Every structure is written in C-alpha cells, then in structure tokens.
Swiss-Prot record:
Classification lineage: Bacteria, Bacillati, Bacillota, Bacilli, Bacillales
Catalytic reactions of this protein: N-acetyl-L-glutamate 5-semialdehyde + phosphate + NADP(+) = N-acetyl-L-glutamyl 5-phosphate + NADPH + H(+)
Biological pathway: Amino-acid biosynthesis; L-arginine biosynthesis; N(2)-acetyl-L-ornithine from L-glutamate: step 3/4
Gene source species: Bacillus cereus (strain B4264)
Gene, per the UniProt record: argC
Protein name: N-acetyl-gamma-glutamyl-phosphate reductase
Major localisation: cytoplasm
Any GO BP annotation: L-arginine biosynthetic process
Functional summary from the UniProt entry: Catalyzes the NADPH-dependent reduction of N-acetyl-5-glutamyl phosphate to yield N-acetyl-L-glutamate 5-semialdehyde.
Pfam families for the chain: Semialdhyde_dh, Semialdhyde_dhC_1
Amino acid sequence: MKVAIIGATGYGGIELIRLLEQHPYFSIASLHSFSQVGECITNVYPHLRNVLFHTLQEIDVKTIGKEAEIVFLATPAGVSAELTPKLVAEGLKVIDLSGDFRMIDPSSYELWYKRPAAKEEILRKAVYGLSEWKRTEIQKANLIANPGCFATATLLAIAPLIRSGMIEEDSIIIDAKSGVSGAGKTPTTMTHFPELYDNLHIYKVNQHQHVPEIEQMLTEWNSESQPITFSTHLIPISRGIMITLYAKVKQKMEIKQLQKLYEETYEQSPFIRICTQGKFPSPKEVRGSNYCDIGIAYDERTERVTVVSVIDNMMKGAAGQAIQNANIIAGLEETTGLQHMPLYL
C-alpha cells in the first residue's frame, strides 16, 4: 500500500520515514515539504544516505491522490485544517499528527490553540485515534486525529480507573514530563542545550493544549468526569514521556484489585505492558518502541491511587501510533512493522 508524508522534514516526519521504510506492507510513494521543495531527503537527513532516494516535493493534492492511498500529515497546528478536506475529497485516508481534528467542539480548539478551528463538516468526520480504545471506529474512518503524546500516555494510564468508576472524578492530578524532541525541531531558548542541560523547566501550567482532548475522552468514558489538574515539564532527555497520575478512590480497596483491573483491561493490547506489582517503568525501557508501560500503586493511608505510564513521545506518542492506526485501517495486525525492541541505550 502506497503512502505519502506531508511535513517529512520535522521530527514526526522523519520518524514516520524510519518506520515506513521498514514496514512490510506500506511503501513510501512521496515525501512533501513546505520549505525544502526540490531537496533530496538525504541532504536534510544524511543518515538516510543509500537508504532512501526521494526528493522532497511540493504539495499537489491531485498528484498525491493518484500516487498514494494513505497520507500522513506531520504538520504544525493549523496546516492540516486547510489541507485535509482536499485530501479526503481525492479519496485518500488521512492520518493527522497535529491537533487540528482532535476536538469535537471547534470552540474548544480555538480556546486552547489560539487559532481558528477546522470547519465543523470535516471535524465531524474525524475519529480520535487512540488505537487501543477506538479500533472499531478507526477501521471505518477516512480521517484519523492522532492523539497528542501527553494525551496518549495519560489516557492509557487512566482509562481503567475512569471507566470503572473507581475514582473520585474531581480528584485527578497529572504530573507530566517530556523529552526535548516533544518541543519540535524549531529551536527556542528553553530547548537550547545550555538552558536545558542539568536543568528542567515547567511550562504551560494549566494551559497545555492536550488538556481538552484528555477531558473530552474522560467525559466519553464517564459522564461524571470533571476538569483535571495537569502540569508539564521539559526534562533533559531527547525522547520519552513519563506521566505520574494521582486520584482518590471512592472506597477502600487493595492493590491486587487495581493490578487485576489493569492486567485484564489490557490483556488483548500488545503494546501495553503492565508492570508487576510494586514495580514502576522508566522512559528508557520504551525508548524507540511503540510500547506504553504502566505501573500502579495504592496508598491505604490517603486512599489515593498512583499510576505511572511511560511512552516514547516520537513513537507511541506520534509516528508509532499513527502507523498502528494505519495498520488497523488496512486490516493488518496492528503490530505490523512496529515490533521493535526498545533501544534502552
């Protein structure tokens, strides 16, 4: 199956290239860029020498429609909203890695992203691509809104609790930490090496744009859901996310009940690994893979549950989940082309 990538020179785009070039059923038909049209991809990323020979092309929707069946959009917020209706009209399946189609309510997007939302007509066609929880909808979709990296790690961690009604809906506190690749390719003072090395930054306190998509899913799972407290931190690693989530339970329980809940919830999900009781994951253990590792604790004294989840923000948080969704669309095993052992070092 032929695929195209729009926004091929960003971090999300280059991770898509790495995965698709090794995929047994998908092949890259074309790579597209806004700013580097005519450049060979190896001039932008020399590590692809003798591996990939594509020249970056301009974005011609009709040509893409003739050459590919699936198109991945690894573009900044706002770009996909303009391009996607044209791509869908050409009969393409679109998987968008930006936030443009994640929110059902356009006013919510405009509030959190500070830009105009996509038209409601195309928003209604989008399926939120949280692979483990939206398989049936993804199979039938023409437009997938790939979840944000923080949202993915958070939702996979909290789903069993919020769906079961075990926790007080207004008690959810999330502490999120991300590697610097999550900030994208464009350098800033905060991501500058001397500023980040041996340091960490808290940012977008109570204002991170992944909050509304998290709350949207929580409400879908549990109509009693309430706004969450969510803080994000930038840490000096290149890739990886750790979510530490706290919530108060409605009635006393034992850790073995929680452990069983998580193990049973995800027993049919090959990319979700539940740590043994008393063990907790770290980002290094999923680096370069599509896994989400989850550990659970329960404090009988405070009656609070703590859930720790880790993902690679470039994989399960972006390109890996996008290809997992493409596999589902294509009727393939969702692990196809994604069974990479974590790098660790």
